[in-house]
Amino acid sequence: MSGPTRAGFEGSYLGANDRISDLAIMECKICWTPYDPASGDEFRQVLPGTPFTALPEDWHCPNCDAPKAQFIVQSDPGAPALLEQNRVDAQVSALVADFREIWHSKMRDVPLVNKALSIEAVGFRSHEGRGLGVLVSPWFMNLIQLPAAGEDWSGLIPGVKEDLEFPSGLYEFIHNRREMVGGYKACSLYPTMGDFQTQMQAVDLARAVMIELFKAENRAETDRAAEIRASRTAELAALEAAEAEKAETAARAEAMAQPTRRRLISAGLAGEDEGAAE
């Protein structure tokens, strides 16, 4: 049995309202009268700024009275942004599906989870060509970055750290991979979720994060660059010290195994001198 049909419009977009943006300028294919969202429809008292998809179902062409279904796309300045958002939305759906599967199969009975919460993606949008948003779950809240169109992140090594710059500061992301969404990068906002009483409370905070993240005035408070640099410097110093100690030990062992010519020549004499001294 086929599902219910959805009212749409004719033309190259095949009546799919979700494939035109709010900026799309439509025109009647009977009399070629345009509908421009910026102008609205004074005849039907439709306010300027009303998208074609938001017009009442009984709206008709103000010139020839043709129904909405007889309108086609004249131009759509917002189409690229809409297509990009649709791409990000598809990635986000896979991300949410991955973590819902983890929740139901592995995490539901773990004592530390907050069962008042659920898996929800909040505020995802395209930023510099990559999907960015907050993932809320019963056991964590993370800022997530997803790959751009054409980028292959399947080779990301889980656990590798990367610093990403935003207007509010420098943030540390950890690489990861999941079966459905593939590679992604995550910045921990809340490693546990016990402080949240409701899903709405967690979602409201996630929305606030997506606003504050892009405010340069928050940089002094949120910039973790110095902290991250200090941590990395300490890690590198410890690594260099370990390597230096290893090299010194190896050099000492090599020296013992391969004595210098002076030692070989003087070794016997030293023994004789010691015997004479006794």
Curated annotation (Swiss-Prot):
Q: Which SUPFAM superfamilies match?
A: Rubredoxin-like
Q: Which InterPro entries match?
A: NiFe-hyd_HybE, NiFe-hyd_HybE_sf, Rubredoxin-like_dom, Rubredoxin_dom, Rubredoxin_ET, Rubredoxin_Fe_BS
Q: Which GO terms describe its biological process?
A: alkane catabolic process
User: Which positions in this protein are listed as binding Fe cation?
Assistant: C28, C31, C61, C64
Keyword Transferase carried by entry:
no
Region feature (Disordered): 250-278
The note describing how and how many cofactors are bound reads: Binds 1 Fe(3+) ion per subunit.
**Ranges in a coiled coil:** none
Gene3D superfamilies reported in the protein's UniProt record: 2.20.28.10, [NiFe]-hydrogenase assembly chaperone, HybE
Residues annotated as signal peptide: none
Q: Where is the Rubredoxin-like domain?
A: 23-74
Identify a single GO molecular function assigned to this protein.
electron transfer activity
> Which key words tag this protein in UniProt?
Electron transport, Iron, Metal-binding, Transport
What cofactors are annotated for this protein? Answer: Fe(3+)
Family to which the UniProt record says this protein belongs: In the C-terminal section; belongs to the HupJ family.
Q: What is this protein called?
A: Probable rubredoxin HupJ
Species assigned in the record: Rhodobacter capsulatus (Rhodopseudomonas capsulata)
